[in-house]
Amino acid sequence: NAGHNPLLVYKAKEIRVEEENVKGTAIGFLEGYKYKLGKIVLNEGDVLLYYTDGITEAENANKELFGIERLKRVLLENSYKSAQSIKEEILKEVDNFREGYEQVDDITLLVVKI
């Protein structure tokens, strides 16, 4: 994951969300850094979710963070939908969680449905 948040993988056959957490430095941070390659076996209906920390670190007025567990729950609850709909549901849930509190970090999502 090149120093970014863990990749979330919804496994349709097991009906669960896994965190693919690989250690490493951010892309471009260290010249000549050798990244490890990994392999994930995917099946029809599985979903890959790449996201920036603007999602998990989104705050509400009580200074609570949206967090990875909420993100995993939203992915699980919407896994039967299209990639576009999953993205929209995540953004809606983050917005509802913030309750109008300012979003100070960027949000980037990439949803891939197999």
Regions found by a protein language model. Name each.
Residues 1-114:
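Conserved subregion of the PPM/PP2C metallophosphatase catalytic domain
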